[in-house]
Amino acid sequence: MSNESLANLLKEERRFAPPADLAANANVTAEAYEQAKADRLGFWAEQARRLTWAKEPTETLDWSNPPFAKWFKDGTLNVAYNCVDRHVEAGNGDRVAIHFEGESGDSRALTYAQLKDEVSKAANALLELGVQKGDRVAIYMPMIPETAIAMLACARIGAAHSVVFGGFSSDALATRIQDADARVVITADGGYRRGKPSALKPAVDEAVERAGIVEHVLVVRRTGQDVAWDDSRDKWWHETVDGQSAEHTPEAFDAEHPLFILYTSGTTGKPKGILHTSGGYLTQTAYTHWAVFDLKPETDVFWCTADVGWVTGHSYIVYGPLANGATQVMYEGTPDTPHQGRFWEIVQKYGVTILYTAPTAIRTFMKWGDDIPAKFDLSSLRVLGSVGEPINPEAWIWYRKNIGADATPVVDTWWQTETGAMMITPLPGVTHAKPGSAQRPLPGISATVVDDEANEVPNGGGGYLVLTEPWPSMLRTIWGDDQRFIDTYWSRFEGKYFAGDGAKKDDDGDIWLLGRVDDVMLVSGHNISTTEVESALVSHPSVAEAAVVGATDETTGQAIVAFVILRGTTAESEDLVAELRNHVGATLGPIAKPKRILPVSELPKTRSGKIMRRLLRDVAENRQVGDVTTLADSTVMDLIQTKLPAAPSED
């Protein structure tokens, strides 16, 4: 990939200064960058002091055996104590920790004092089932408070949890149970999704059968649906946990004690079990949650819309917010049940002040229309966040304008399952924000963009995003496979962490993420990022969402093929397709014009909302469509395939 190839095609000139009152009272000011630059390890040692340690660490970082980092290694702490007990001891036991909103409209509030009792009871129940320090527990749950309680109960007794998203198949669950050697599974009869109960227990029964190692299955009753039952193995949560003592004294564990394993899909073969440990992970998740959202725990109401099954839910529903003593909303269901204004109804009901959601959701809201959020009082919101993939500038502007009253900062956060916590993001009280850019590494984080030879690219240049210094919440290894850890993340550039993202620096040196490197297309010798072409398409008033892939082309090497979802009532026509093609040409340059544009009703997405471009590539190249098991709706691909041959092409 040549330097100029990813040069900044898209010029974004809009800037948004921080609101004056927020900047004046911000938790983190511009000085933090200078302080961290002057003494990076001292900076992280200071952030670690925001936690409560049983034994304070004297050593910040041991990097004697790279790439295996040890942070705060002589310190000891209990993660659950930090997330629950210490707030009760500080006199905040009556503060609401979780406002739970069920999809069907049921709700309950859990205070920190109640959460402490529930976590203690669950910890005692796990001990009774024979779970010991160092064991692994698999969790396959809907979005209900018991999911967070189960995770914290594991942390409390020193057992590592492996949460598997409730949308995954029994096969996926079985391989994860086997890989982690989990002897206990915590699940529910089901959860509510799109207005009806969605069963979870049958997948667990199949997975447990296949794995052959599970001794106990603990089942929360959520929906009341019928479940198959094995008396020798299955236990109801309410019968096992509710009767336990609410007294449990948490033990302090080493800072490097395993906290959880979270599986992420590998490009090849079996999923990778990403291992996170205790002290460094909690230090960085707590700090970033407090800094990036400017959290004031006494007054803010935080809502992260992710599922706990993803890293965003681990770091910014369970660990970061609770370590900071925040009050937050947890919502079980989908954004359009029972109506398309459900998210805004929830913001209004709880007075949500900080909202953290994904670009895929924002683009969906755009498609549904501006009039829906306009019906609700969203004036409580003061900071908006985005996570999961690069956000198109137009979606960013829509989010700020329609959800944030054209006044709230939008923090576009880049990080990964592997990084554990936010890495590159604006700060709401400091940064003059640019729509579509994550901008700069947080204080204490070292990231840059390099070319093929690992040389840092100049401003205006593009290449690969790398992390050049260890960070507290970094993955420690791939569970059971140190060699794969080295090969996957540390082999491409000597001494640098690289996880597959392309990026560019603009003329100010700010970082723009360009999606996965395999989402970079080579058209007539020019590298063109799918993210930029998608952003150009979405900036057209008729387009709600776009997915772009490169398809092999005899003439140009790769041809750009775009799949677009039109807004609201827009009718598809050949004229519109030509207009969109010209719009991309005018926005990015003629080289970036898609060869084919196909209006579709839906795009293939994983259950976490990421677009599965590889499947679209299969369609665009007339191949048999590959593995669709992680798709939220596998019928989408059939619809797209039947339509493609008729789509006009620009020859």
From Swiss-Prot:
Class in the EC hierarchy, top level:
ligase
Alphabetized PROSITE patterns for the sequence:
AMP_BINDING
Sorted keywords for this record are: Acetylation, ATP-binding, Ligase, Magnesium, Metal-binding, Nucleotide-binding
Key word ATP-binding present: yes
Binding residue positions for CoA: R193, R194, G195, K196, T312, S524
Pfam families per UniProt: ACAS_N, AMP-binding, AMP-binding_C
Q: For binding ATP, which residues are annotated in this chain's numbering?
A: G388, E389, P390, D412, T413, W414, W415, Q416, T417, D501, R516
Q: Which NCBIfam families match?
A: Ac_CoA_lig_AcsA, PRK00174.1
As for family, the record states:
Belongs to the ATP-dependent AMP-binding enzyme family.
Q: Which protein is depicted?
A: Acetyl-coenzyme A synthetase
Classification lineage? Bacteria, Bacillati, Actinomycetota, Actinomycetes, Kitasatosporales
GN (gene name): acsA
